């Protein structure tokens, strides 16, 4: 059986009218209850208004003890419950004030941001005053760089944390703050790509970039820690520490290699992309034909379904692709690259996306076109 009680309360501290509705033998799902010592509806409402996460309240037992319904979800659900508790919802009721000669300038809503700790990690609380409080949060948090969530509790571990749900326009590419494994902030470069087919955004976090003229500084495999200017994302000489790469990779599912991204943007001539589940570039220690999602070298390409590339990474060699051995070993991406002119054994060939050994370089490959050409490695999801 339902019983409805509607009335208006005027609080001196708020100068705002609220209509409170009671429904007997109901319970709220989607909130946690916080007990108080209040035993009157008015005092319970006042207590609730001071807490931004309070969306309703209940009073139970013979002494009518007040409990606050705390929730940050979009909407709460009312369900049947047998017992001695009454659930109370409230909403603003300015109409009552107007009927009694009030003016719009006289009404001041309670700023719960001043009376409760709502946002974390230095997030800025902004009160909101929805008419339907039960189905709309009473606050928003402006999160500082590196955090997200409705209360700024979630550290952003990769560029993926800055992407909103499907259908939204992607963020602008550029430098963003993310958090490492110790929740320490650092800057990275993010590239966001809107996928037209799925209407989703893929985010890419840059972990390494260098000019061809700086190739000797980037001979270490990814499983060795060899940071370069790790606090200053740049295209000429940059590499994150291994620990930060691992932290980003935990929030990633794929990787890619690009050429001259700083000048040409995303160009899929001389481009390679793979899945972490098939090739983990942070642990890969071999030289073999490996599955990739896509590879294009000088216009020759293959895509997902039947696509392999000869990938090399060892303790004395950085991660890269050998297009000569890809053809020699009959990988599915078997276009023939040049053999190294300085290699008497004939086993090594054209380096793509890294290493660039003297005599193993093809200037038609965009990454090694000239001394200022750049090579990038990214982790994405």
What label would you give each PLM region?
Residues 2-113, 117, 128-140, 144-146:
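Extracellular disulfide-rich cysteine clusters
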Residues 2, 99-381:
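Mature extracellular or lumenal effector domains of secreted proteins
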